Each structure stands twice: as structure tokens, then as C-alpha cells.
Amino acid sequence: YKIMLPGDYIAMKLSGDICTTVSGLSEGMFWDFKNNRVADFLMDYYGFDSSLIADIKPTFAEQGRVNAVAANELGLKEGTPITYRAGDQPNNALSLNVFNPGEIASTAGTSGVVYGVNGEVNYDPQSRVNTFAHVNHTMEQTRLGVLLCINGTGILNSWVKRNIAPEGISYN
């Protein structure tokens, strides 16, 4: 058995290979940023065997190849390399070209998210924000994504429309 995030599971179903990334491990709180390794202290505290952690691959690197079963079911070419995976907010920041300290991605959908990149290992001691290894984080170059999530942003837009803009009146 291995601990897998959704992207790890999808890649495993495509390739048959089980692996993960530092970014993925950090989203699962399994990464020790100060020592640049799996958070053994957390694994030990909860009694998790370290063998549950999958092999770690770079975020941008070959992480497997599409196998015959997946290729046949999905109409993909067998052997196509799987070369990237990350969580939703790191992916959003990537799509908006947010890579460097001080750069911010902000989106509003079901939730409202502000995601900024930091170049230092630090954290919020009150846990008001989440910190992940950003897609371009390496041991040599710290790039941490700091995420503030405001749940209910999308439903707020609906509430405003129903309660402030009567039927027949557009936002324009």
C-alpha cells in the first residue's frame, strides 16, 4: 500500500507506476521543508510506516508512461510519457505564470483563493493559510505556495444576485 493523492492515483492508473512529488507530499502534510525530506517526525507520531510513501519524482520529469490497458481504454498512444502533476491551486498558479516570490494568483469560484509564492521556509503558526511546495520548488531554490481559501465565495455571488439584483435586472 502507498499513500496517494488524486494525481498520484490517476498517474498510477495510466502507467501502473506508483510515485509522487514533493509538491504532492507537501499538500498531504508529509514534507519537512526545513530538512528537505519526508516528515519522518509526523510519520512516527502517527505510527505510519515510511514504506507507505511512494517513490519521489521531480514535478517536471518523466514519472511513468501510459501502459497498454490505459492506452486502449482512453485512445492514447501506449508509451506516452507522464511528465507533470500537481494540485489544483499550484496548477492554477502555473497557468497564470506565477512562479516567483511576491507573485500572486487569485481566483473565485466555489471558493475564493489567493495563492502567493514565497521564497523562504516559514509558516503561519495560527494555521490560517496552507503552505505547499510550489511546482518549481527545489532543494536549491525554495518556492512555496501560500494558500488562503475563503469558502463560500461562489455561493455569495449567487446570494448577491438573488437579493440585491431583482429578477430582470442585469449586472450590466
Outline where the language-model segments fall.
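Short beta-strand to alpha-helix junction loop
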Residues: 32-34, 59-63
